[in-house]
Amino acid sequence: MLTDNRTWVIVLAGGIGSRFWPVSTLERPKQLLPLVDDGPLRTDTIDRARSLVPDERIRVLAGEHLVEPFRSSLPNFPADSYLCEPLARGTAPALAWAAWHIAQIDPDAVMVSLHADHIIRPREAFQETVNAAVDVVLRHDLLVCIGTVPDRIEVGYGHVEPGERLDASGGLKAYRVRAFHEKPDRETAHRYVEAGHLWNTGIFAWKARTLLEEIEQHAPEIHRHIPLLEENAEAFFKVVPTSVIDRAVVEQSERFAVLGATFTWDDVGSWEALARLHLSDAQGNVIVGAGQTVESSDNVVFTDQGSVVLFGIENLVVIRTGDRTLVLPRERAADLKELLEQLDSEA
């Protein structure tokens, strides 16, 4: 458990996981799927949250269609721990609602925001890092982003440029944020890694009051609708614009710190993640499900129905689920969101 007994944990459990299409869909997004271990990602995340705070200080933010799958897999989790989003409006309105909700109870309470679809190991290092992040929040009244040291060049992640060193507990390294850099090109990402920038994990800690203040300053188009929450969540979500917290607040705020994590982290962001999270064969093929390769190398295969056989194939992602089969080059795995937008426009 965390040292501070006023901290809350918010689990962001919405999102479609479009880069895991066709397995991940609106009705069955990736956080409900056993993509890495035998159990779904959501179960691991709730266990992680429970290692920090008691159940009564955990809130799960999810669309109404996802609450029942959570409840069925977590029968002992309190029913009032779910904040059901009436409409999908992105992480900024969702976290504004969560901050308002917690501020009604304790305005100076610290919120730790987690995603339901990340892989984090080991648990002890995660607890140590979050405890230090909460300590930075309480010492400096800053908003804290948890960052990790890059182990490769990655254009799909936000990068954090550290500045002035700050005190942090447990010997961890914390810094004022000099700048956030969103999803650079490959050459720029390489420069960031060489310069000691960190990846933005999307795990944040901040006081409920402080987040609401920053939303008021940097996202007034969201803040002006917060009084509607006195009525109900539906009134708020009907009128609030869609926005993500990174663009609405994180990249604009001058009150951010970054804390270097001691855990390993993966956002399981695309099919390419399976190559990092599963063992490959001698030819570099990663196979999840029933698959076989002959004279093939460096492929990623996932099937939850039937089997897949590859012959003389290299560097492909091959996905089979239900009545759909997807085949694409591995280097295009991160582009699936754009493919879905094109398919939707042509439908």
Segments (PLM) and residue ranges:
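Conserved beta-strand scaffold positions in the cores of enzyme catalytic domains, especially
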Residues: 32, 82, 143-145, 255-258
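Solvent-exposed alpha-helices and their adjacent loops that cap or buttress functional pockets
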Residues: 1-5, 12, 51-53, 104-106, ...
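Fold-independent oxyanion-binding glycine-rich loops
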Residues: 14, 63-64, 86, 114-116, ...
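Conserved N-terminal catalytic core of the sugar/cofactor nucleotidyltransferase
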Residues: 1-11, 19-29, 34-131, 148, ...
